[in-house]
Every structure is written in C-alpha cells, then in structure tokens.
C-alpha cells in the first residue's frame, strides 16, 4: 500500500492539471480519498492505494515550480516500510529516503 501526500505553495501554472491524470492512472483502495485540489495559491495531492506513479508526480512538480515555490511530497511505502520525502524550495526539488521507523527524522530535517 502507498500513501502519497503533497503540498506545493506558489506552484507554477498548470501543476494541478499535470497531476490529475496521474491520479487516474493510480490504483486506489476502496474508499480512498484520491484527489488533486487547488486552493489559495496551493496545490494539494492526496492518495491512498496500491499503485501511484509518484516518480512521474515528482517530475511534474519539478517541471511546474518557480523560485518562489515551497512545499513537500511524502511517499509512504507501507509494504517496504519506507518513506521518501521530496522538498521543494528555491526552485529545486530534493529528496531523502529512509525507514518509516525513523519517520520523525523526516519532520523538518
């Protein structure tokens, strides 16, 4: 099972439109709240399910950020007990991965 959550503040134009098709490719669980929303200058992504093309989502985010964009995307792989966090800051996207046992280490770095 995967859980993917993202928030991008001040994204470049078109980010939500780039992420929405990825939700349609995803394989979710029954009752999963899978959505991409735009609100008050922020794009939010929420997914819970079996498969989500998170590498493509990271690529879409990289393609649609500006120097003013900030935020993060968390990919929680429950089967392999891993977390990957993408950091969005200063026009770049970086990431770190580790065990979910150390998830608190990923809160803020």
Segments the model singles out, each with a brief description of its role:
Residues 22-109:
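Charged interaction segments
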């Amino acid at each position: 099972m995967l859980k993917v959550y993202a928030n991008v503040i001040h994204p470049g134009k078109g980010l939500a439109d780039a992420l929405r098709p990825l939700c349609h490719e995803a394989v979710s669980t029954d009752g999963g709240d899978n959505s991409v929303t735009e609100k008050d200058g922020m794009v939010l992504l929420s997914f819970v399910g079996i498969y989500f093309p998170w590498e493509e989502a990271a690529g879409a985010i990289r393609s649609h950020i500006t120097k003013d964009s900030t935020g993060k995307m968390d990919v929680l792989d429950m089967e392999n007990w891993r977390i990957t966090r993408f950091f969005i800051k200063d026009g770049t996207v970086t990431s770190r991965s580790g065990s979910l046992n150390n998830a608190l280490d990923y809160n803020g770095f």
